A protein has these predicted regions:
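SAM-dependent transferase fold signal centered on methyltransferase-like domains
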Residues: 1-159
């Protein structure tokens, strides 16, 4: 995952698009390696493209602009469910939300898209980096690398 957040990797990931079969994987690996891209970069791009393809079931078209880990995708709240949670918080008058153990930021995306101020907290730095990428379009969302049990919640309306 070290090279995934580079401009080159993100460009290649967009070029690769969806991967639907093992034949696609082989074809894309061959093409990228012939173009001179390092094996590690190609592996990370292929892995991410496959995760994006699988993520469409949870995130619809949003998956094509997100980054995932295997565990993060498996544990992420489905977009429709996160949207219901976010709507309930908004209707309840809550404005400042702490999303503890945010993972890749699925719930935080829903909160932020409704205009709620979100601080997403994730202990794992690599997962937090992906959450930051996924939340980048929202100026009302931030990600902090921290232990959720130690995080100060005094300034938040809801957790």
């Amino acid at each position: 995952m070290n090279q995934l957040l580079t401009a080159e990797a993100l460009r290649l990931l967009d070029e690769v698009g969806e991967i639907d079969s093992k034949a696609d994987v082989l074809s894309i690996i061959t093409k990228l390696r012939k173009a001179g891209h390092p094996a590690l970069l190609v592996t990370e791009v292929i892995t991410q493209a496959r995760l994006r393809t699988r993520a469409k079931a949870k995130f619809g078209d949003f998956a094509s602009s997100m980054l995932f880990t295997e565990a993060g995708l498996e544990q992420a709240t489905r977009l429709q469910v996160a949207a219901v949670h976010a709507e309930r918080l908004k209707l309840g008058g809550y404005k400042k939300i702490a999303d503890l153990g945010c993972g890749i930021g699925a719930d935080s995306l829903a909160f932020a898209s409704l205009g709620l101020e979100v601080t997403a907290v994730e202990q794992d730095p690599q997962t937090a980096a992906l959450a930051s990428f996924n939340l980048a379009p929202f100026p009302n969302a931030e990600v902090q690398v921290s232990d959720a049990e130690q995080f100060d919640l005094t300034s938040f309306d809801a957790v």
